[in-house]
Amino acid sequence: MSEEMLYFSGLSDVLRMTFVQIMIFSTIAIVIFLYGLISNFQKWGTGVTGYALEPQEGKKGSAITFLKTWWSQVTAESHHRGESILEILILDILFQRRILKRSPFRWVMHLFIFGGWMTLFALSGMMFAVEMTEKIGIALPFTPAEFRDFLSIPNYIFGYILLIGVLVALVRRLFVSEVREASIMYDWVLIGIVFLVTISGFIADGIRTGFIWSFGLDPSVAPPAALFHSIFSLLFCIAFIPYSKYIHIIAIPLALLANKGGE
């Protein structure tokens, strides 16, 4: 078995996080996320009895009934739109053509935020898969530490893509009058959280490597800086999603698939 990979996060250089500790924090975040997601499914399914059936007043929402009804609507034949599920996934959900038609500038901003966020999430999932594979004893042609180093460049690239998207969103809210007037404090808090998550990641990495974002801080604070970024990201980029307006990253794709597209 390969040598244990040293994690960047910790209370100090000596007290680094272990794989088990990271899995505990991750599991807590995922459980909170799933509880909120199921609660939303129950809320959306209130009164639902089935696809094409009349709602039943006072009927308690069921997540299973909601998902069954949603899937029946997704797979039902449409007479006004003939788009396939694959076409909707690519054009409406990934490419976000509805936003492009309304505003190309806003589309670029959304694509940077959505693409950066989801790609970084996928890269983290790949890292987790490699670690789990190594933990259960399956031989790989590389170690988890080598794979983490391999992912460093994509992480930098999509981290900056996310940062650019967030900065554009902040500039729009500050200097575009109609956007500023339509924004409430809750909107500012949400975009501020994403900005803090993104910046804290760059700063934690900069302190550790001494590259650009270190701000002259002592390298000894690199582990707690990385720990702050990790816990903050788990809380607000996973656990918090179903309880905030960011649930739209799940709700909108579900609606687009059920309604056979967004054109």
Swiss-Prot record:
**Requisite cofactors:** heme b
How does the protein's chain sit in the membrane according to the entry? Multi-pass membrane protein
Q: In which pathway does it act?
A: Cofactor metabolism; coenzyme M-coenzyme B heterodisulfide reduction; coenzyme B and coenzyme M from coenzyme M-coenzyme B heterodisulfide: step 1/1
Gene Ontology molecular function, alphabetical:
CoB--CoM heterodisulfide reductase activity; metal ion binding
Q: Name one GO biological process term.
A: methanogenesis
Enzyme Commission number: 1.8.98.1
Which principal EC class is assigned to this enzyme? oxidoreductase
Q: Which reaction does this enzyme catalyse, per its entry?
A: methanophenazine + coenzyme B + coenzyme M = dihydromethanophenazine + coenzyme M-coenzyme B heterodisulfide
Indicate the quaternary assembly: The dihydromethanophenazine:CoB--CoM heterodisulfide reductase is composed of two subunits; HdrD and HdrE.
Can you say what this protein is called? Dihydromethanophenazine:CoB--CoM heterodisulfide reductase subunit E
Query: Which organism was this protein described from?
Result: Methanosarcina barkeri (strain Fusaro / DSM 804)
Give the encoding gene's name.
hdrE
